[in-house]
């Protein structure tokens, strides 16, 4: 490898392997044998373990390698891509329940209800796999970036949740993590002494700070891109990416058909939880002032009274993902911005 093999993802497995699966069945290999073979492949993806620092191991909850496999979705012509191998991939994962492969299921209005149910049954096992990706949002998103419709329909997932166009693009798809909760913290500190501030003012200040720090993030990301080009070209990988040979350019020099880096907004659920608690306890219930809340944060809730406040913030107010639109929409507004 030209890298550390992290996030060596396998793309739309059920698409490109389906022909071989069907051919084996026609040639007399039993479904049971093929199921065992696929199970062994899933187990094999757990052989490679990246050595991480203790902090990284804590952050990643172990040593995942990001062997992500994408299932379902659409064909390039716009039909549902779900097939019998899609089902088998989930069935075999249910048998092993290991950290890898990291399965991702693409859903859209054409998805078979039975496959959607199979996906839900697998999630219910509690491993956090598979992840769900919404074609109705992602495909138009790629179109907005100048990607052709056929290529946009053929996207896959790489690493954790990053989106890519297999064989057609190079990008540091996880080049930066934009901490939305940190932006909220900055905004609270900037306004803690303003006794007339409203909740809407806080939201607008958060958006203004997003603009400010996104620009800094872009500058930093451009430096990383340039550094990769100058100090770490990857000629072997470039041989397998469309247009690189024709252009005579390494992927780090922009030789691929599509070239863009990816960033992630993180802390979305925490942002919703925090904004909702802020709205309730400061602006609606008026139990404490904004300054008192920031002071509690600065002290890390040390002391009896601050501990009571911490317990109330955790337990009293609804949280993201519990069918409360008011909570969920707080982060939706920020993300759409």
Give residue ranges: language-model regions:
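Conserved catalytic cores of very large enzyme subunits
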Residues: 1-337
